[in-house]
Amino acid sequence: MSSLSIPRQSLYYVNKVTEGRSVSNVQVVSPCQKQGQTYVTAFTPLTSNVQVHTSLEQLSTIRNADVLIFNNALSQIITNADLLTDFLKNATNATAIGGTVIIREDLKDCSDKRQVARLTDYFDVFRTTDSDGNNTGLDLYTVDQVEHSNYVEQNFLDFIFVFRKKVFAPTTDATITFRDFLDKTQYTNTGIDAYEWMFGVNFISPGGYDENLKIIKRFGDFKPGQTMLDIGVGIGGGARQVADEFGVHVHGIDLSSNMLAIALERLHEEKDSRVKYSITDALVYQFEDNSFDYVFSRDCIQHIPDTEKLFSRIYKALKPGGKVLITMYGKGYGEQSDKFKTYVAQRAYFLKNLKEIADIANKTGFVNVQTENMTPRFKEILLEERGHLEQNEAEFMSKFTQRERDSLISGWTDKLGYIEKDNHNWNFFLAQKPFPK
């Protein structure tokens, strides 16, 4: 598989984020002068004004950069919160509002192999007041793996963080962004570990490996080398399963940096270049048109507020004849209890029923639309998994606390109650992008 050079991969993101806006001031901070010059060459078609700096100390001299790039410049400060804060303040102040900030950092030698989650969180929630009194920060576009490192060096922990400087409304909320909300509520590190114990190794969705394989096979025949986008890839079990079982190349995305840090650590151990991951929002990332044979999502899109926009983006990303398969939490047709409404609000879910999903799919232009209420199977799985915990409580308690145990038992029991009242459904959706007439 071919890969872009690191500077050209950076240029690719700049073109995506700027969406054609003019760029006249590109600043590069690279301790390695030779590597810094490769950015000059790559960005020359965009602008002749590309300046290279070899020290973070020079950052304070930069202002109004349209593009600010850091190439392996943070290795001495990434574990020091005070120095990181100073860096982010200087980087934000050096960038024009609407400008692009790209941070390339190779984390393979970090003792903490999940350092990417810590940095993503730190960068994503940082805010500072500029000279005009604006509350500014870095709006996350994506955290991607460096393609050259993946394919040439088998290093899966070399990253490019891509942000756009933005003015944010002041907030006193405990969670600053939706990614921050996910990682501090449902997908804490302990929460993820407990989910994985319940669902099975590498999975945090109902039924684990076997159920996922059964669902995946409903796509039909796969051919080695075909491509799949996995939205809400979690800790990566489904992506690696499709690559292992069918030879499909998978681009897995998730907004939870905690979950993807686990997926990335395991991918680095396994060295499977058929799989790559991005920490990003499916409603933000600019996928290439007509680029995937399949789009897959397991129990994720209930987190996404705009289903119409999501389906439109999936449609554009699929090749003609490509298929999309989604399982999702949905709402039933029974009168919703107050307890269920509270649960939905706490999880920040945006639930649809089967008819609403089918209507959106048809309106988007999909054909061969199939929907199915899989709630009876969901009930079976919930009973099996709750029973697994009750029968193996000693093992669970050797790894987790009483609080985690009680939370899982009550969560599974509550879902069974929601199912009985036809509040909570588990829905299946399969459709195809038509071939041109």
From Swiss-Prot:
InterPro entries, A to Z: Methyltransf_11, PMT2_N, SAM-dependent_MTases_sf
UniProt-recorded Gene Ontology molecular function terms: N-methyltransferase activity; phosphatidyl-N-methylethanolamine N-methyltransferase activity; phosphoethanolamine N-methyltransferase activity
Disruption phenotype: Essential in multiple developmental steps, its disruption causes developmentally impaired worms.
UniProt cross-references to Pfam families, sorted A to Z: Methyltransf_11 (PF08241), PMT2_N (PF17987)
Any GO BP: methylation
Pathway where this protein functions: Phospholipid metabolism; phosphatidylcholine biosynthesis; phosphocholine from phosphoethanolamine
Keywords: Lipid biosynthesis, Lipid metabolism, Methyltransferase, Phospholipid biosynthesis, Phospholipid metabolism, S-adenosyl-L-methionine, Transferase
CDD domains reported for this sequence: AdoMet_MTases
Cross-referenced Gene3D superfamilies: Vaccinia Virus protein VP39 (3.40.50.150)
UniProt catalytic activity: N-methylethanolamine phosphate + S-adenosyl-L-methionine = N,N-dimethylethanolamine phosphate + S-adenosyl-L-homocysteine + H(+); N,N-dimethylethanolamine phosphate + S-adenosyl-L-methionine = phosphocholine + S-adenosyl-L-homocysteine + H(+)
EC number: 2.1.1.103
Activity regulation info: Feedback inhibition by phosphatidylcholine and also by S-adenosylhomocysteine.
Chain residues that bind N-methylethanolamine phosphate: Q186, Y187, Y195, Y329, Y343, R347, A348, Y349, K415
Group of enzyme by EC: transferase
Binding residues for S-adenosyl-L-homocysteine: I204, S205, G232, D254, D281, A282, R298
Domain of life: Eukaryota
Described purpose of this protein according to its UniProt entry: Catalyzes the last two methylation reactions in the synthesis of phosphocholine, by converting phospho-monomethylethanolamine (N-methylethanolamine phosphate) into phospho-dimethylethanolamine (N,N-dimethylethanolamine phosphate) and the latter into phosphocholine. Phosphocholine is a precursor for phosphatidylcholine, a major component in membranes and a precursor itself in the production of glycoconjugates secreted by parasitic nematodes to avoid host immune responses.
Family: Belongs to the class I-like SAM-binding methyltransferase superfamily.
Protein name (Swiss-Prot/TrEMBL): Phosphoethanolamine N-methyltransferase 2
Recorded name of the encoding gene: pmt-2
